[in-house]
Amino acid sequence: MIRKILLAGVAIAIAVARTALAGANGYVFEPVKAEVKKGDDVIVSVRLKHKATGKPVTDAVIVQTRIDMSPDAMGEMASPLTPVPSNEPGVYSFKTDLSMQGRWLLSIAAKVQGEPDTVVGEITFRATR
């Protein structure tokens, strides 16, 4: 009986350690809408989620962003990003100019409370007519 209790305790400790050690890899950025219209003042939005729980991360601080056409071999075609408010928990939105149709790569980095490492992500958006 004691052995079963000890084994259960070890299993719980391992599960907790794995979650704690996941660090920045325990989070994921996802596009809210992967296809957007090309043009000026386009809003692109990403959702930051904790992988283990699936819950949105609402208190992240975005520390770096870049959007360019590197998926279409035009990495020099970049556009500035301006943060805009979002009413949805865990959603981070940006206004940008997507001057051409094609694939645009949003590179993003965020600090999440309680995580020593920076959470990074790359999300591809498709700009259409």
Where are these regions (language model features)?
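Sec/Tat signal peptide C-region and signal peptidase I cleavage site
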Residues: 16-22
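Bacterial N-terminal signal peptides that target proteins for export
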Residues: 1-7
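Contiguous segments within soluble domain cores/interaction surfaces
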Residues: 22-129
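A generic, residue-level signal for flexible/boundary positions that often mark functional hotspots
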Residues: 15-16, 51
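Bacterial N-terminal signal peptides
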Residues: 8-15
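General helical structural elements
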Residues: 7-8, 22
